[in-house]
A protein has these predicted regions:
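N-terminal binding-site loop/beta-alpha segment at the start of enzyme catalytic domains
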Residues: 1-68, 85, 144, 205-208, ...
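Acidic (Asp/Glu)-rich catalytic clusters
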Residues: 7, 55-67, 92-96, 165-168, ...
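Active-site mouth loops of central-metabolism enzymes
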Residues: 13-25, 74-81, 123-128
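Short, acidic/polar
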Residues: 22-35, 80-95, 134, 159-162
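Short acidic/polar active-site loop segments enriched in Thr and Asp
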Residues: 40, 98-101, 149, 173
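A short, structured active-site edge motif that brings together acidic residues
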Residues: 65-78, 102-108, 176-179
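Beta/alpha (TIM)-barrel catalytic core signal, keyed to glycine-rich beta->alpha loops juxtaposed to Asp/Glu
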Residues: 76, 109-313
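CE4/NodB-like, metal-dependent polysaccharide N-deacetylase domain
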Residues: 84-105, 141-145
Length: 313
């Protein structure tokens, strides 16, 4: 399995299993099957509400812990410095682990403590209510305590990362962002290379199975794109495999989600597909700057956040 080297010298598997949208009752079986196939990288989050089942699967893993890479994420309601370590400890308890390999700030958005999804204006905290450097310092203390080896961010712009790094003692290892041929994120890819921050691509297949409330009318379907389908035929592969191969060819970590044993194997085998320059050129022409996961549900009339602030500041 291909790995990338982080600034710390640690090696992260380039391919992993996403667990967002994996339903209770399905995810334990899926993770066990993935580990059996040879997956070594699991991407989790407290808000996915399935870390307990992931932990049950991890408890049955017969291999050594150091062979696995496990990522989780700090939810928006636990950004106060005093809430960071308890949130991480809860995740470790659920995952049945003594430490994570990577812990990310899930979104640069603050909720009041204990809120899962805000239902009123008073459950949002404004961006400046909790300076990101304070949350980050609490994460650094978690590294020093041995609870996580690396820390990073998710859904952060370059400007927000720059603000964080002005006072950071530990630089972000990863920025996990939506990334696929319809949202190629070239500027962020270049920024990451310049700063030594690796990108992880979430929703690499277009997140067609996300909740209806997060979908827009007449949105494009990535897996049905003609160029992707033609490239798949050329390589005797599936469209999903081409999308995974494309992400790997650009030097990003990729974490497709599936609970289907057949697709778990197909996704794993995508690591063997090598796209040529012509393939990459054709796919590079597909960029629409289209976000399937745009955070609009955080930018309601009750919220102090806007899409412009989220993605452009």
């Amino acid at each position: 399995m291909e790995t990338y080297t982080l600034r710390s010298g640690a090696k992260i598997p380039a391919f992993g299993l996403g667990t967002w949208k994996s339903k209770k009752g399905e995810v334990e079986k899926a993770v066990k099957e993935a580990l059996k196939i040879g997956y070594k990288h699991l991407d989790c989050a407290a808000i996915y509400s399935n870390e307990t089942e992931v932990g049950q699967a991890l408890a049955s893993y017969a291999g050594p812990r150091h062979e696995l890479w496990v990522t989780s994420k700090l939810w928006n309601s636990a950004h106060q410095p005093e809430d960071v370590r308890p949130a991480l400890e809860r995740t470790l308890l659920d995952l049945r682990l003594t430490h994570l390999d990577l812990y990310l700030i899930h979104w640069p958005i603050h909720f009041t403590a204990g809120v899962v999804f805000p239902r009123s204006a008073d459950q949002f905290l404004p961006p400046d209510a909790i300076p990101v450097e304070e949350t980050w310092q609490a994460l650094e203390e978690c590294v020093q305590a041995g609870l996580t080896t690396h820390i990073g961010v998710s859904n952060f712009t370059a400007q927000k990362i720059d603000a964080l790094m002005r006072t950071a003692s530990i630089m972000p290892a990863i920025n996990q962002i939506e990334l696929h041929p319809y949202l190629q994120q070239d500027a962020m890819l270049n920024y990451g290379r310049e700063k030594g921050i690796l990108l992880t691509a979430y929703a690499p297949l277009g997140s067609g199975d996300r909740p209806k409330i997060m979908k827009k009318a007449e949105e494009p379907v990535l897996l049905q794109n003609k160029t992707i389908i033609e490239t798949a035929k050329k390589h005797k592969a599936t469209p999903g495999q081409v999308l995974i191969a494309w992400a790997l060819a650009r030097g990003t970590v990729v974490i497709p989600k599936s609970v289907n044993p057949k697709r778990l194997r197909e996704n794993f085998k995508a690591q063997q597909i090598k796209l040529d320059q012509e393939d990459m050129a054709h796919i590079s022409a597909l960029d629409l700057e289209w976000r399937f996961v745009d955070g609009e549900n955080f930018c309601t009339a009750d919220s102090t956040y806007t899409l412009d602030w989220l993605w452009n500041e």
